[in-house]
Amino acid sequence: MPGSRRVRPRLRALLLLPPLLLLRSGHASDLTVAVVLPLTNTSYPWSWARVGPAVELALGRVKARPDLLPGWTVRMVLGSSENAAGVCSDTAAPLAAVDLKWEHSPAVFLGPGCVYSAAPVGRFTAHWRVPLLTAGAPALGIGVKDEYALTTRTGPSHVKLGDFVTALHRRLGWEHQALVLYADRLGDDRPCFFIVEGLYMRVRERLNITVNHQEFVEGDPDHYTKLLRTVQRKGRVIYICSSPDAFRNLMLLALDAGLTGEDYVFFHLDVFGQSLQGAQGPVPRKPWERDDGQDRRARQAFQAAKIITYKEPDNPEYLEFLKQLKLLADKKFNFTMEDGLKNIIPASFHDGLLLYVQAVTETLAQGGTVTDGENITQRMWNRSFQGVTGYLKIDRNGDRDTDFSLWDMDPETGAFRVVLNFNGTSQELMAVSEHRLYWPLGYPPPDIPKCGFDNEDPACNQDHFSTLEVLALVGSLSLVSFLIVSFFIYRKMQLEKELVSELWRVRWEDLQPSSLERHLRSAGSRLTLSGRGSNYGSLLTTEGQFQVFAKTAYYKGNLVAVKRVNRKRIELTRKVLFELKHMRDVQNEHLTRFVGACTDPPNICILTEYCPRGSLQDILENESITLDWMFRYSLTNDIVKGMLFLHNGAIGSHGNLKSSNCVVDGRFVLKITDYGLESFRDPEPEQGHTLFAKKLWTAPELLRMASPPARGSQAGDVYSFGIILQEIALRSGVFYVEGLDLSPKEIIERVTRGEQPPFRPSMDLQSHLEELGQLMQRCWAEDPQERPPFQQIRLALRKFNKENSSNILDNLLSRMEQYANNLEELVEERTQAYLEEKRKAEALLYQILPHSVAEQLKRGETVQAEAFDSVTIYFSDIVGFTALSAESTPMQVVTLLNDLYTCFDAVIDNFDVYKVETIGDAYMVVSGLPVRNGQLHAREVARMALALLDAVRSFRIRHRPQEQLRLRIGIHTGPVCAGVVGLKMPRYCLFGDTVNTASRMESNGEALRIHLSSETKAVLEEFDGFELELRGDVEMKGKGKVRTYWLLGERGCSTRG
């Protein structure tokens, strides 16, 4: 085997020991597995701390299945393949194997994993006729069965890497030459040497191409420089096996030398994915990132890099196996097993042991023995097996077919992701559907230069032409030159003519002033999307909390927006004329159309297309407008399309992009305004709220300039777009920072300082996609070069919004439907609010006036006074109220009356009565009107009076809780006249002698007693249940002597109230 070391002489003598002398007695039902692996050094993928838990899991499954090795017990014995320094040894491993063979006579050996340890042990086991299983020893030489007759490899092998590279070359059309570079580590198991050996031998065998190879030493910059010169002379397709840091350093030097992805491709042979931090590692995987100040260059260099790793299984059995493996490793082996591609090695040992047990079981069933190593080994070869690592296929040479993955960098995010998978069994390359190989030129570079590495192609060396060819060439060039010069002269003349014509000029007299309110009246009762018809957000300014909107006017019959320019005069220099020409040349549906300009002092102004739906800022801040994500993405796409046109045109950049400069027209199309014409822009005030509020969208590098360019920069526009994107996503205002209430001045100062991390608005991943948040962060990156251009932003938005149609009509109809739905919701909301207010007003009206009277007034009818033949009126007051009021504060008196009348109002709700009024401590109630109830009015009032009296006895005065409130009640029955009096604060009043008499009954009564007139007593006697007591004749003012009664109660009925 190339690169393998010679076995020492004393080990050769051990091979001569007769196998029979090594056999020791044991139990017939015991099957011994001898393990020879590193026992202390856990850095090896096949260390015992990693493989031991897998072996125990495999033996556990054997015990759980009665069909495997019935009647047999599997036991393990251990031997170390390490030397005293903890490194794999070609001496320690064979000695351990001999000791295990002599003492335990094992039926099978498990391991070693290191190549130099496995080589002598593999030769011994072939001599002893004992099978050897390993998921390591991946070198090409271990596959030579003349020496390793009974070795079966259930893990990856490097010759299979050559199969993957062969398929890759065939797919990409590389049929001539490749270069292989590797860092050889002589002190250990030389992993890169054996990786390159397998690739080199298999590719040369299968493709018959030239494969050059070069060894190098890691950490030597001079050596790296010489290595890159070799790359320039011998390769365009380069395979490099080294540590991740060395590969990154090489890529940086390659970038400096001009070896970029247009002409070169570098494959990192990183089979265990160390540069990717493990296949299950953190996302995104960025092997170029180190935070050492070189990341930006490294990311650029890695556009020419791809990474080759083993393919990690993703079947459910493997994922469940990993959980059990980690738990057992931690619990029993005191080892914390991390995620990564190294875990496929213990999984392959697990599957290999199960495959061996299956082969032994079959051998025993056919009359064989566990010591028949050749028969058992042949049963494992050329066989398929379903294990935890998925579909396991051992070929006819005893090597497992290995799957590989190819990783490539996403140019937008810089993260590496799998783009191709190789199936080792079918020898097929399978593309990952959502990812594609990235090539800077759109296609892979050729494996040899166009003219060869040494410019040896004859087609590139024709250094002379015939006379006729020279004349033809000169004549053609002369003609083309003449046509080009003529074309440019014509263009120059047309341009001068257009500049002189001043087609943009507008006379102030041609403008007909018009307020937006008048325009809306002439257009009918149209509603705008923002709900504010007078708003033209593209030209608004803010001063404190007040908004001043641009004026409008009619020009040639069309309504236009008029922006006044705060300048005394505009000098029409050639620069200004070109600015005006460029504005007239703008024709894009996502940019407001430039109508013209007036430069006549003092009426200097700019006329642009008027958009009636308002600005994006107004729409976002109006909480009554519902915007789903389809609508938001549509508005965002409109901004991107407009900015793409600006950046690719003569204007070049906006310089003042913000949500208030994005307006919505009548067709719900968002348009960008206030672009170009930097000579017309108002000089900024030195300080004030307005200045800082305007700068919330400005990029930090422009804020730090003493005199930033009026046109801004393209990277600055991307930053402004990122701020707008956050406004659209959160709808919480411009530069919203959760938990902080900062003024615009404070925000601008923190952004300008350049804090680490940079001070930026908040994001809420619950309200938008994580990818959208990443796009925001890229747009407002501190380094302008890290911000994506609008072309990349457009592609990213397409990924977020795949389900929405790109058809203009479909988008317009969707916006119209969204707008209609929003209007329906708004009308429904306003209707419900109106009905609620109407209900409250009616409830208040019914408390002031009787229900029937209130209904008449609501219908607009005049309430006529009405006479009632018989009603019962109740009067009450508080005895000693005047003295009590004098001894109390006004607030205490108000509280007392409020508590008392609240109690009374709750009681009278249980009776057919109407409360007429309260005056001070006087309380007046009537029954029998406005709805007549026959003779029931006397009974209702009598019962109510008893209930009120009962309530008063338990009533407590807040500021005099020990004092009893003394209520005096008078009741009288008779005719009255009732009606509504007055137009302002109308009141329902009662008139007639009955009212006066009832009042006299109350004033001549006694505290805590109910005083009745004889008329009321006569009506109550009809109900036969009230207890009355004659009081006698009482002298009343204006009435003379009147016979009255006391109401004591009602028989057979508890007092209500």
UniProtKB/Swiss-Prot annotation:
Class of enzymatic activity (EC top level): lyase
Post-translational modification: Phosphorylation of the protein kinase-like domain is required for full activation by ANP.
Bilayer topology term: Single-pass type I membrane protein
Record note on disruption phenotype: Npr1-deletion mice exhibit weight loss, elevated blood pressure, and postnatal death. They display systemic hypertension associated with cardiac hypertrophy and ventricular enlargement. In addition, a composition change of immune cells in the spleen can be observed.
Residue intervals on the Extracellular side: 29-469
One cellular component (GO) term of this entry: membrane
Segments crossing the lipid bilayer: 470-490
Subunit structure: Homodimer.
Protein purpose: Receptor for the atrial natriuretic peptide NPPA/ANP and the brain natriuretic peptide NPPB/BNP which are potent vasoactive hormones playing a key role in cardiovascular homeostasis. Plays an essential role in the regulation of endothelial cell senescence and vascular aging. Upon activation by ANP or BNP, stimulates the production of cyclic guanosine monophosphate (cGMP) that promotes vascular tone and volume homeostasis by activation of protein kinase cGMP-dependent 1/PRKG1 and subsequently PRKAA1, thereby controlling blood pressure and maintaining cardiovascular homeostasis.
Name of the protein in its database record: Atrial natriuretic peptide receptor 1
Species of the source: Mus musculus (Mouse)
Lineage: Eukaryota, Metazoa, Chordata, Craniata, Vertebrata
Encoding gene (name): Npr1
